[in-house]
Amino acid sequence: MKYLLDSNAWIGHLRQTSPAVTQRLSQHPPTDVVLCSVVLGELLFGVERSAAPKRVTNRALVAALQQQYLSLPFDDVAAEHYGRIRAHLTTAGTMIGSNDLFIAAIAVANGCTLVTHNTGEFSRVPALTLEDWQLP
């Protein structure tokens, strides 16, 4: 099984504020855990918003993730899922944030379980398997 970690899971791990996430991450080989281009963009946005002394450290942490874990792109298959998911959520009147929609589409397209603490929002997406590693 592949696990796609959402930004909040990676941030908790990198900041060492979510020991449960770090523990669960250590239980899986790096080949079972992935990033995606949208999450990477969110992490890099956080790096750019960091104060100058912290920015170098944060950039190094994100670079280490990029070296250790595969990053899945938003490709044509994900675009197909995006269209279906967005149409479903729009019709149901239960839209989610635009970045979350892209992340969900990438997870579904690649058969990944999405690891997030934001289960309330992501649970609206049909066919998306979720796990919250921040829970004990």
Residue ranges, per PLM feature:
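Short, well-structured N-terminal submotif of metal-dependent ribonuclease cores
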Residues: 1-36, 47-64, 91, 136
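Active-site neighborhoods of divalent-metal-dependent phosphate/nucleic-acid chemistry enzymes
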Residues: 45-48, 68-115
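Residues at the C-termini of beta-strands that transition into short coil/loop
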Residues: 37-39, 75, 134
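Alpha-helix capping/helix-boundary segments
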Residues: 9-10, 39, 78, 102, ...
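Generic structural signal for small/hydrophobic residues in well-ordered secondary structure
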Residues: 6-7, 21, 43, 82, ...
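Acidic, PIN/NYN-like endoribonuclease modules and their adjacent C-terminal/linker elements
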Residues: 1, 104, 108-136
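Residue-level recognition of specific faces of alpha-helices
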Residues: 24, 37, 61, 81, ...
